[in-house]
């Protein structure tokens, strides 16, 4: 009886039973997808802002709020959720891959005595996992950018993808399979910048707040440090993000691409639209970052609790 009770509370060897890695990866992807449902409108507004005024044209939107109200007026409530299927697939591929790579590398680099990797090594692991996940998620990213951009174009110029799978099939058939990875370099670069900026700015912000004497090491301090970290991360990654967005949305003109590479995008944006146009869409990008992270962890915790209650207890 005692042995049975011990096995029920934990494993046969008395150790606590934990979720399999495959379940953890699955839950990570599902949690990211759940959060995306809530922040998709912010992603759409950010993408529209980054494409507004492209090529020295008159800006379609003055502010992020103007963009949101214009989209609602012209395309309705469903319009702000355009590209949701692509956003969900991006999370399913990017988040799951990133989590899987991070876990594998973390375990490989953990010492034989159980000593975890140091801060710098964890940063390298995080950036490597982020870049790999971004590469795998690039096809969904291309579909997302094009689907969210469609509504701003005249009807005869729209691509008219029905959903993310229709987009991927048509892109492959009409432009070649390599087009699915168009902009993968800036996409991977953004992931590296985001991971590096988040790690460095969060720890520094937290230490600064604690040293000020006004904060203790509690949830308020963590929240404020997260907000500062989000601000730094957004500022650092937006120029790379606008390069990614424009490359993935560009068309071929007389057989030639609108942009040669990410640097060409940055030079043209600064030349024709002004230096600060590199940060177009800053508000929705920053507003998306915090809620998406918080919601992802909330969903992840709830799924883990439910799994333990249903399959690991008793």
From Swiss-Prot:
Top-rank taxon, per record? Eukaryota
- Please give the residue positions where the record annotates the modification Phosphoserine: 6
Q: What is its main location?
A: mitochondrion
Q: Does this UniProt record's set of keywords contain Membrane?
A: yes
A GO cellular component term found in this entry reads:
mitochondrial inner membrane
Q: Where in the cell is it found?
A: Mitochondrion inner membrane
| InterPro entries, A to Z | Mito_Metabolite_Transporter, Mitochondrial_sb/sol_carrier, Mt_carrier_dom_sf
Q: Name one GO molecular function term.
A: oxoglutarate:malate antiporter activity
On this chain, the residues bearing N-acetylalanine are: 2
Asked whether the UniProt record includes tRNA processing among its keywords, one would answer no
Q: Which UniProt keywords apply?
A: Acetylation, Antiport, Disease variant, Lipid transport, Membrane, Mitochondrion, Mitochondrion inner membrane, Phosphoprotein, Repeat, Transmembrane, Transmembrane helix, Transport
Q: Where are the transmembrane segments?
A: 24-42, 83-101, 119-140, 183-202, 222-240, 281-300
Q: How does it sit in the membrane?
A: Multi-pass membrane protein
Residues with PTM Phosphotyrosine = 102
Expression sites (tissue/organ): Most highly expressed in the heart.
Q: Which residues carry this modification: N6-succinyllysine?
A: 57
Q: Which GO terms describe its biological process?
A: gluconeogenesis; lipid transport; malate-aspartate shuttle
Q: What does this protein do?
A: Catalyzes the transport of 2-oxoglutarate (alpha-oxoglutarate) across the inner mitochondrial membrane in an electroneutral exchange for malate. Can also exchange 2-oxoglutarate for other dicarboxylic acids such as malonate, succinate, maleate and oxaloacetate, although with lower affinity. Contributes to several metabolic processes, including the malate-aspartate shuttle, the oxoglutarate/isocitrate shuttle, in gluconeogenesis from lactate, and in nitrogen metabolism. Maintains mitochondrial fusion and fission events, and the organization and morphology of cristae.
Q: How does it assemble?
A: Interacts with SMIM26.
Give the record's family classification.
Belongs to the mitochondrial carrier (TC 2.A.29) family.
Q: What is this protein called?
A: Mitochondrial 2-oxoglutarate/malate carrier protein
Species annotation = Homo sapiens (Human)
Q: What is the lineage of its organism?
A: Eukaryota, Metazoa, Chordata, Craniata, Vertebrata
Gene encoding the protein: SLC25A11
């Amino acid at each position: 009886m005692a042995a049975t009770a011990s096995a029920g509370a934990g494993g046969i060897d008395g150790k606590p039973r934990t979720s399999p890695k495959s379940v953890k990866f699955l839950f990570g992807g599902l949690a990211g997808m759940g959060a995306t449902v809530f922040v998709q409108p912010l992603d759409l507004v950010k993408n529209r802002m980054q494409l507004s005024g492209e090529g020295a044209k008159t800006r379609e939107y003055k502010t992020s709020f103007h963009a949101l109200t214009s989209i609602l007026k012209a395309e309705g409530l469903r319009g702000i959720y355009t590209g949701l299927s692509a956003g969900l697939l991006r999370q399913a591929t990017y988040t799951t891959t990133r989590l899987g790579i991070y876990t594998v590398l973390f375990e490989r680099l953990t010492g034989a005595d159980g000593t975890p990797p140091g801060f710098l090594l964890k940063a390298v692991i995080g950036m490597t996992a982020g870049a790999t996940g971004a590469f795998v998620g690039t096809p969904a990213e291309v579909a997302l950018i094009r689907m969210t951009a469609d509504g701003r174009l005249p009807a005869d110029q729209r691509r008219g993808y029905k959903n993310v799978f229709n987009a991927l099939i048509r892109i492959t058939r009409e432009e070649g399979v390599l087009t699915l990875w168009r902009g993968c370099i800036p996409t991977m670069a953004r992931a590296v910048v985001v991971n590096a900026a988040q790690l460095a700015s969060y720890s520094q912000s937290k230490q600064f707040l604690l040293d000020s004497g006004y904060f203790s090491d509690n949830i308020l301090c963590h929240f404020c440090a997260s907000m500062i970290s989000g601000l730094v991360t957004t500022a650092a990654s937006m120029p790379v993000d606008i390069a990614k967005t424009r490359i993935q949305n560009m068309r071929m003109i007389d057989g030639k691409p609108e942009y040669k590479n990410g640097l060409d995008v940055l030079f043209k944006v600064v030349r024709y639209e002004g230096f600060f146009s590199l940060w177009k869409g800053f508000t929705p990008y920053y507003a998306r970052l915090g809620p998406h992270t918080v919601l992802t962890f909330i969903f992840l915790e709830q799924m883990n609790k439910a799994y333990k209650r249903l399959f690991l207890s008793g």
